[in-house]
Amino acid sequence: PCFLNYKAGAYGFRFSMIEASTEINDRMPEYCVNRIGHILERRFHQPLCGSRILILGIAYKQDIDDYRESPAIRLINSLQTRGAHTLFFDPYITSFQLEGKVYEGEDELTVELIRDVDIVVITTPHTNVDYGFVQRHAKVIFDTRNATRDIPDRSNIELI
């Protein structure tokens, strides 16, 4: 849609719906940071600052290893700016660079890793992740992609 909007602009046309959706998408990482903060406060009376957050999925789209333009990167940056400690697991991406710093992902999605964080945030719905396993061991999940839709026990799952 962005390319279509760009090309239309070159010919003097505007697609206000595309412009509005782009603006909403650009604000989504900050919206998610606020939601994560509210979930932590409401469920655990815990501030975002100092919380341990596992980001599940860095890739731009499911089942690929490309993180360029990934909203998960902006989400991590915003969370860290607000004092949260972030970790990530992505079966396709072992590390990424942000502002000259290299971020190393977790090697495995283990019971210990999931239990050790305050919240798991699903940002990329990879098909080779066992979300039932994550749900059984997480304190709470914030699912931004509805990856947990088939899990019957929703007591610790919050959707965007």
Predicted region positions:
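Structural/interface elements that position substrates and couple domains in central-metabolism enzymes
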Residues: 1-160
